[in-house]
C-alpha cells in the first residue's frame, strides 16, 4: 500500500513537471531569442542559450517606435478601465442584490442578456456613436464601450447576495445611507472577488488589440498590442526584435499576477462557492 502511494506521487509529480517544462519552454525561448544578435537567430544547431548575449534588440526597439509611450498608454487605459468597470459593476451588483424595487429580477435578466450579444455585432454601432461624439483617436473612446460589464456585475451580485442582511439592517438603524452601507459594509466583505475580477479585467484590457486598433490612429496614442502588430509588419524577419517587444508586453501582467495571486485564487474560490 505504501509503495503504491509512493508510485502515485512519483507519477503525479512527473506529469506535473513535464507539463511545467512544456509551458516554460516557449517563454524561455522568447527570452533567449530576444538576447541574440540577428546573425545568431537562424544558427544551426539551435542556440538555446546565446553564445553572445546582446541587448541590441531592446535598444533598437525604443529607437524605431515610441515603445515607452505605448507602455504608458496601455497602462493608463488598463488601470482606468479596470477601476471604472469594477466600480460600476460593484455598485450595480449592490443594487440588484440588496435593494428591493419593482421589476428588479426582470431588469437583471435583461442586463444579463447582453452577455449573449457578440462583441463583433456591436462594434460598428459603437464606432459610429463614438464618431458622432467626436471620441475617435481618444483613450475615452477606447475605454467607453467596456466600462459596463454584465459578467462582473453578475459575479459580484452572487457574492453580495450571501452577505447577511443583518449587517445592513444594523447599519440602517444607525442611520447609514446606501452609499455608506455599500462602502463600509459590503465592499470590505467582497474584497477577494473584487480583486479577482480586477485582475481579469486588467489582463483583458492590457491584451486588447482589435478595438484600440480601430479607434486609435495616432502613433503617440497606440497601445502596446497595436504597436507590436505594427512591429511585426515592418520588421517581420527580426525575430529578436519581436521577442523583445513581446517579452516587455507580458512583464506588467506577470508582476500584477505575482503580487495578487493569493487574492485571485481566493476570489475565484469564493465566487465558485457563493455563485
Q: Whereabouts are the PLM-identified features?
A:
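A structural signal for multi-pass alpha-helical bundles of membrane permease subunits
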Residues: 2-275
